[in-house]
Amino acid sequence: MSNVLLIFNQLRAAGVSRAGALGLLGNWKAESGLEPCRLQNDFSANRIYSHAYTADVTAGRITRTQFARDQKGYGLAQWTYFNFSTGQGRKLELYDFWKKSGKALDDVSMQVAFALHELTTEGQYASLWQILRTTDDI
């Protein structure tokens, strides 16, 4: 099954409206080309830098701290943000979510699950979550 269908079906199963799911798909298409291993600014043939980066994170050659702080967008949503004052950030949370999931870092369903986790547990996304569930307009 294509990434488009996997993502769409997972979003719909979580309660996102058809238009909301299509809107997220459009955003993630622009962010990553819907490639879950996509590293920011990797325009190489076959995404060789993205695959090498993913392998290095998976093998521990890039540590949790390095992954979180390198300011390189990663994955479907190009998670990047890190707050050096608080030591928290979206990419750090992606890393921790991935480790607990038991799935591959570049697993599409894991990344969609993480996005849904952000949308439903982070107060700053409450209004966006409401829109994604109820909108009928892309």
Stretches with model-predicted labels:
Residues 2-6, 32-133:
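Peptidoglycan-targeting cell-wall enzymes and recognition modules
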Residues 1-34:
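Export/targeting segments at the very N-terminus of extracytoplasmic proteins
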